[in-house]
């Protein structure tokens, strides 16, 4: 796995006192079969967040872990929970909650891949598709780990399709999004907490920290270990960020076509703020003979899965999406992100541009702004302590 360790090691952390840093996976005292899975997956040595958080999760302590997008957060909690699972017991022991179906499915696959030599029984449980096949497998082989979205997981718990009495660990991935009022997951997550054993270990993972996470800390966590990236380190150093002032909204399309023609890119994601604009933009580009695919939350799950699979395997090179794709989806070859609209939620900026430059790679993020967006741009710069420069005239130099 290609990984810019030099960039990763520049990260500075604020952590709980006397926190041990493990420079190798061997020093973490992991199960042999788990180590085999880690190396087969392509990891050679732990990233900065992995070297600090995995041993804390394994120790059974509650953990709040923060790191920039693409630094191996998913593998951090996955390795921790796989180490904790008792393979002799076939009942549910670990539960992972994520804000989107795509992310929950991806995490489920990571659990299976890293746990390949352990023969762990892991399932992704999300809305939008039938559970008949998964339920048959769960009943036949047992279910030791579940990655899912809050609504579907809670529904299955209430219907007693998932038994939670032996759950040892709950992971909240992209916790700031999970707990935000806008998505409406917060009460569902609180209801899930109420169904878990009181001594259940809680791991909270997020790229940003906010008051909702602090509330969960107070209510459900016991003296958590904190592993936080210093605020000025969250600007994603490996990604060149530029702004293009288009003056008027209607000029964005022509600007996008100019960039499209000028850049040599591997893969690109274009973000819009509404589903309607995603559909409009993809139709306009297709009419202009550009090859693009699109995805948003109103599409059927089968359609979203096909779009994701085509993009992940490289069959399509340009994806237009709403923020449903901004969180944690790992496609290694994305080298360019274009914010056709600046994000309405300021924390989503880091999640969007983190789609390029995954896991320490170099990437480019281009932000289109009109006069009406200037205040929002200044807000983003202030929040992340960054300065986003105008894009140079020679587009080709970015590729």
UniProtKB/Swiss-Prot annotation:
Motif Q motif per UniProt: ranges: 23-51
Keywords annotated in UniProt: ATP-binding, Helicase, Hydrolase, Nucleotide-binding, Nucleus, Ribosome biogenesis, RNA-binding, rRNA processing
CDD domains attached to this UniProt entry: SF2_C_DEAD (cd18787)
Subcellular localization(s) per the UniProt record: Nucleus, Nucleolus
Molecular function GO labels: ATP binding; ATP hydrolysis activity; mRNA binding; RNA helicase activity
Positions annotated to bind ATP: 67-74
Enzyme class: hydrolase
A family per Pfam: DEAD
Catalytically driven reaction(s): ATP + H2O = ADP + phosphate + H(+)
Function: ATP-dependent RNA helicase involved in 40S ribosomal subunit biogenesis. Required for the processing and cleavage of 35S pre-rRNA at sites A0, A1, and A2, leading to mature 18S rRNA.
Protein family according to the UniProt entry: Belongs to the DEAD box helicase family. DDX48/FAL1 subfamily.
Name of the protein in question: ATP-dependent RNA helicase FAL1
Organism encoding this protein: Saccharomyces cerevisiae (strain ATCC 204508 / S288c) (Baker's yeast)
């Amino acid at each position: 796995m290609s990984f810019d360790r030099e960039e990763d090691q520049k990260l500075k952390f604020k952590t709980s006192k006397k926190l041990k840093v493990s420079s190798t996976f061997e020093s973490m005292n992991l199960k042999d079969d788990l180590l085999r899975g880690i190396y087969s997956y392509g990891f050679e040595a732990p990233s900065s967040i992995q070297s600090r958080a995995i041993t804390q999760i394994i120790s059974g302590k509650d953990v709040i872990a923060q790191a920039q997008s693409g630094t191996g957060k998913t593998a951090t909690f996955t390795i921790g929970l796989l180490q904790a699972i008792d393979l002799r017991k076939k009942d549910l022991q670990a539960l992972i909650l994520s804000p989107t179906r795509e992310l929950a499915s991806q995490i489920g696959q990571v659990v299976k891949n890293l746990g390949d030599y352990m023969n762990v029984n892991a399932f992704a449980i999300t809305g939008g598709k039938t559970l008949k096949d998964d339920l048959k497998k769960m009943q036949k082989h047992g279910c030791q780990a579940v990655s899912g979205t809050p609504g579907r997981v809670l529904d299955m718990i209430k219907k007693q399709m998932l038994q939670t009495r032996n759950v040892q660990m709950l992971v909240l991935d992209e916790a700031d999004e999970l707990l935000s009022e806008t998505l409406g997951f917060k009460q569902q997550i609180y209801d899930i907490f109420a169904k878990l054993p009181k001594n259940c270990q809680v791991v909270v993972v997020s790229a940003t920290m906010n008051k909702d996470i602090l509330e969960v800390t107070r209510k459900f966590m016991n003296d958590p270990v904190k592993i936080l990236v210093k605020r000025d380190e969250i600007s994603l150093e490996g990604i060149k960020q530029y702004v293009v002032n288009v003056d008027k909204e209607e000029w964005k399309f022509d600007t996008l076509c100019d960039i499209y023609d000028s850049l040599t890119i591997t893969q690109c994601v274009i973000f819009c703020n509404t589903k309607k604009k995603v559909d409009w933009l993809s139709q306009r580009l297709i009419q202009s003979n550009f090859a693009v695919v699109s995805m948003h939350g109103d599409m059927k799950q089968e359609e979203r899965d096909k779009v994701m699979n085509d993009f992940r395997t490289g069959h399509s090179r340009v994806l237009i999406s709403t923020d449903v794709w901004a969180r944690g989806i790992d496609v290694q070859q994305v080298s360019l992100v274009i914010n056709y609209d600046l994000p309405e939620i300021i924390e989503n900026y880091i999640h969007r541009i983190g789609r390029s430059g995954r896991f320490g790679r170099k990437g480019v993020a281009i932000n289109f702004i009109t006069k009406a967006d200037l205040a929002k741009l200044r807000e983003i710069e202030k929040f992340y302590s960054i300065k986003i420069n105008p894009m140079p005239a020679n587009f080709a130099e970015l590729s």
